[in-house]
Amino acid sequence: MKKSIFTSLYLQVLVAITIGILLGHFYPDLGTQMKPLGDGFVKLIKMIIAPVIFCTVVTGIAGMESMKAVGRTGAIALLYFEVVSTIALIIGLVVVNILQPGVGMNVDPNALDTKAVAVYADQAAQQGIVAFLLDVIPSSVIGAFASGNILQVLLFAVMFGFALHHLGEKGQLIFNVIDSFAKVIFGVINMIMKLAPIGAFGAMAFTIGKYGVGTLVQLGQLILCFYITCALFVVLVLGSIAKATGFSIFRFIAYIKEELLIVLGTSSSESALPRMLDKMEKVGCQKSVVGLVIPTGYSFNLDGTSIYLTMAAVFIAQATNAQMDIWHQVTLLVVLLLSSKGAAGVTGSGFIVLAATLSAVGHLPVAGLALILGIDRFMSEARALTNLIGNGVATIVVAKRCRQLNEKQMNAVLGGRDSALRDPIA
């Protein structure tokens, strides 16, 4: 029996977002009161992220024939992340220099109210490469799961998977238990996703109700430049990578349209992580590749965040008339190559990394963060959407490079033009 269009999660979330925008615009006070709906949905998603990553990574690694393949997958993924995120940083830098959205604003940094950004500056002071690397190691396994730290859970899951693999037949019972537990967890995910329209409605109503459409108009040029840049990056850069890998970026976007709408409503790519793990397996990527690439990409492959960081930093310099010659911009790029890896796929993380970057560069006024604080919530949506698409493309690319991609299945799912591609897994 053909399913009704009204049962489509895609349509339900789209309608919910539209209603949320209207409510927030016409009844802003009521709209801001809808915040708990969005927060509640995101908390439900975060509740199951740690067990999903653990189960996916452990069963993926333990089920592989060779441990060398795991190391090769990780190395290829990290190399891909570094190259593509660097391209994203450079594109953001080039576009903001060409369009110059901040030129002519002539803002005095000393006149800005920095109270609102003080909390971000304080968090940014805690950022650092050594601190970031040490934070990957959990103080306790229970603590890693309790805090929902993706990289900490991933580290433990990889070690657990290796140990389980070395047990061989003795570990089969544990493997079966974890595999069965994973099926239960994905059942829980399906239950939670039925609440996605409510969560998207609440988050969008709050955003529009609190910040208003007027905020968009006030600094609309920067927002427009950023959205255009993200769109160009997805179509041109990720599109070219997708084409070289054997699939269409537009078909892939259509394939993950429900996840994209959930991200649009919540402004966090993390909210779609559990479903992305499942969908990337269904598109033909081996579980071991999906389990490594997707969670790692949430800290090392945030293309949208990379574009945002360079554009926002230079915009602040332009708006406050801070000097930014070619060497200052090269310094900014080098700093961002490191600091951008500390961002996670959660709302607000990009703003914290931006604060850390301004502090590290030195000659850019941290007070300038106050300029974009009001519109950061709107820009975070484009960041999250680009991050999600980028991590999905990365998974397919790495899977193909590691010969862990069922290309026949990929073409069947995405409707690719070449249905006669070989199946390297079979």
Swiss-Prot record:
One of its GO terms (cellular component) is plasma membrane. GO terms for molecular function: fumarate transmembrane transporter activity; malate:proton symporter activity; succinate transmembrane transporter activity. It holds the Pfam family SDF. It is found in: Cell inner membrane. Responsible for the transport of dicarboxylates such as succinate, fumarate, and malate from the periplasm across the membrane. PANTHER family: AEROBIC C4-DICARBOXYLATE TRANSPORT PROTEIN, PROTON/GLUTAMATE-ASPARTATE SYMPORTER. It is a multi-pass membrane protein. GO terms for biological process: L-aspartate transmembrane transport. Disulfide bonds: none annotated. InterPro entries: C4_dicarb_transport (IPR023954), Na-dicarboxylate_symporter (IPR001991), Na-dicarboxylate_symporter_CS (IPR018107), Na:dicarbo_symporter_sf (IPR036458). NCBIfam families: PRK01663.1, PRK13027.1. Keywords: Cell inner membrane, Cell membrane, Membrane, Symport, Transmembrane, Transmembrane helix, Transport. This is C4-dicarboxylate transport protein. The lineage of its organism: Bacteria, Pseudomonadati, Pseudomonadota, Gammaproteobacteria, Enterobacterales. The gene is dctA. HAMAP family: C4_dicarb_transport. The chain crosses the membrane at residues 4-24, 44-64, 76-96, 142-162, 184-204, 222-242, 326-346, 352-372.
